[in-house]
Amino acid sequence: YHKQLRAGEWKNNVYKGERLVYRSDRIYGIDISKHQHVKGKKKYGINWSKLRIVHLGNISKKTISGSVNYPISFIYIKSTEGSSILNPYYKKDYAAAKAHGYKVGTYHFFSTLTPANKQASQFLKHSFVRSNDLPPVLDVEPTHEQIKKMGGTGVLFARMRTWLRLVERATGKKPILYISQTFVNRYLSQAPDLKKNYQVWIARYGEYKPDVKMAYWQLCPDGKVAGIQGYVDINVFNGYHDAYSQFVSSH
C-alpha cells in the first residue's frame, strides 16, 4: 500500500496543498453565462477574436511568473438551470466559441427545488454535447439551508446521481461535478461513490491547489478577460499540455 505522496506545503502539521505558480504554459479556461452579457440594464457582446486572460483577480494571493496575458484553451457555457431556466445567450456563445476554435463544454446549474429527471431533460433538450466537446458539467452549489429544506444530503446526493446517470446515458460522456471546497469538506465524504467515480471541477479561491481528484480548478471569480465586459471566472486545468491532450481525447 503506497500512501500518495503529497507535494505541497504543510503548516503546523496541517497539509495546506500545493502552491501553484501561474505561468503562460499552464492550460487556462473560462466559464461564462448570461452574467457576461448583462450588467444592470446594459447588454454587452463578447469580442471573440480578442479573448486573452489579462488578470487573475484580487480575492486571493497568487504567485505569478511573468505578466498575465494568457491564451484561453477551453470555455464552459451555462445552458440551463433547474427545470425551466435557460441562458438566452447559450446557443450564440456556443456557436461563436466553436467557430473561433475553442474547446467547449456546457454546464447545468442544479436546483434543489425540482426533480432531477426534469432537470436532466431540460439540460439534454437545450444543450449541445457533441463528440468533440468537453464533458458536460453539473454545477452544484446549494446552501446548507437549501439542503436541509430538500430533506438533507441523502436526498441531494440521490438527485445528483439521477442527473449524472441520465446525462451520461444520453450523451455517452461521464459528467464532471462542479463543487466548492466547502462542499468537499462538509458533504462529499457522505457520497464515497461520487468522490471515487467522478472528476470534479472545484471552486477554491485560495493560494493552494485543492487536494481532490480534479479536472479543473476555478481559482478566481474576479478575473479579467480582454473582449469580455466585467469579471470572469478563471480556471486552470490540473496538468500540463500532454495531460490535457490526453484528457480531451479520452473524453
Predicted regions and their residues:
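Glycine/tyrosine- and acidic-biased, solvent-exposed loop/turn segments at the edges of beta-strands
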Residues: 1-24
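Sec/Tat-exported extracytoplasmic proteins
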Residues: 14, 55, 79, 98-101, ...
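Functionally critical loop-and-helix segments that line ligand-binding/catalytic clefts
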Residues: 17-41, 59-63, 193-251
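Substrate-binding cleft of extracellular glycoside hydrolase catalytic domains
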Residues: 25-46, 52-162, 168-170
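Surface-exposed, flexible loop/turn segments at secondary-structure boundaries
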Residues: 83, 112-114, 183, 208, ...
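Catalytic domains of cell-wall/extracellular-matrix polysaccharide-remodeling enzymes
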Residues: 135-211
